[in-house]
Design a protein with these regions (language model features):
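A generic beta-sheet turn/junction motif
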Residues: 74-78, 190-192, 222-226
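Bacterial Sec-dependent N-terminal signal peptides
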Residues: 1-42, 254, 258
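Outer-membrane pore/translocation modules
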Residues: 40-55, 61-64, 89-186, 235-237, ...
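Outer membrane beta-barrel transmembrane domains
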Residues: 118, 122, 194-237, 242-244, ...
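Membrane-spanning beta-strand positions in outer-membrane beta-barrel proteins
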Residues: 45, 80, 109-111, 158, ...
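N-terminal, post-signal-peptide region of Sec/Tat-exported proteins
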Residues: 66-93
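Transmembrane beta-strand segments of Gram-negative outer membrane beta-barrel proteins
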Residues: 38-53, 74-76, 81, 197-199
Length: 265
């Protein structure tokens, strides 16, 4: 039987997986199971985006070509399951991220959300199979946690921090990543025809293993309440960094938005 020895994680690699990340993931998965058994209002929705350039959760990383993005959500009062599925336009998977999130503080000007996810990043690699090099479609596996405090000053202005800690358990790097961002959100800005603009500028610091960098990015989205079509754009500029990647990244996309609320008894 062929062996993909090049891409099998070692036992040692699995043992040193940070206990905190594992704890977060198991706790949130258990909480989601509890939520599924509870009655109350649930909401299912999402955004499907077709873009000229797939951009990752960390905007300094991209697919580098057109992509189709599925951001889905099943949420209750406090818990939500938010899968993010990314594909190239050729139908090949790029990344699958399965978020579990908990709203620790809600319904107040100050909110706090924590979350965790397993993630799978797909790519074509040259690997050795029975001593011969072959090009195969393989996945890298990651586990991550997030903490997101936010303060809402008004219906149009919010500010907060976002921290993402990731760990890979693969035979190749990256092994550890830390992402810390200062967020500002300007929302409900009228742009005509009942359409509203949302702008999310972000200054962030990223550390990946022994490399690090500082960047500034901004997301723009235009949508209309009750209308399923929206538009988005992103720009990301490297300020100073030793992390490999483009100095400037941008994309534009068209979105399909949907949402439905139902009562579980």
């Amino acid at each position: 039987m062929p062996r993909l020895a090049t891409y099998l994680p070692s036992t040692k690699k699995l043992v040193i997986l940070p206990e905190l990340l594992l704890f977060f993931t198991l706790t949130l998965l258990l909480a989601m199971q509890v939520q599924a058994q509870e009655s109350g209002s649930k909401q299912i929705g999402g955004v499907i985006t077709a873009t000229n350039n797939g951009v990752s959760i960390i905007p300094s990383f991209t697919l580098g070509r057109p992509a189709l993005l599925f951001d889905l959500s099943l949420s209750g009062e406090r818990f939500s399951f938010d899968p993010m599925l990314r594909f190239g336009m050729d139908g090949k998977p790029w990344s699958f991220v399965f978020w579990g999130r908990y709203k620790a503080i809600k319904d107040k000007p100050f909110t706090l959300t924590v979350g965790a996810h397993p993630a799978f990043i797909f790519a074509e690699r040259i690997v050795k199979v029975n001593g011969q090099e072959k090009t195969m479609f393989v996945s890298q596996r990651f586990l991550a946690m997030e903490v997101a405090p936010m303060y809402k000053f008004s219906n149009r202005l919010s500010m907060g921090l976002y921290y993402l800690r990731g760990h890979g358990f693969n035979p190749i790097p990256p092994d550890n990543s830390n992402f810390l961002a200062l967020n500002t959100v300007f929302s409900n800005i009228p742009v005509g025809g009942d359409f509203n603009l949302r702008v999310n500028p972000q200054l962030f610091y990223l550390k990946v293993d022994d490399t690090s960098g500082t960047y500034i990015t901004s997301n723009f989205s235009v949508s209309k309440p009750g209308f399923p079509i929206g538009f988005q754009a992103l720009v990301n500029q490297k300020i100073k960094s030793t992390i490999p990647g483009d100095d400037f990244i941008w994309n534009v996309g068209i979105q399909y938005l949907f949402s439905n609320t139902f009562q579980k008894k």
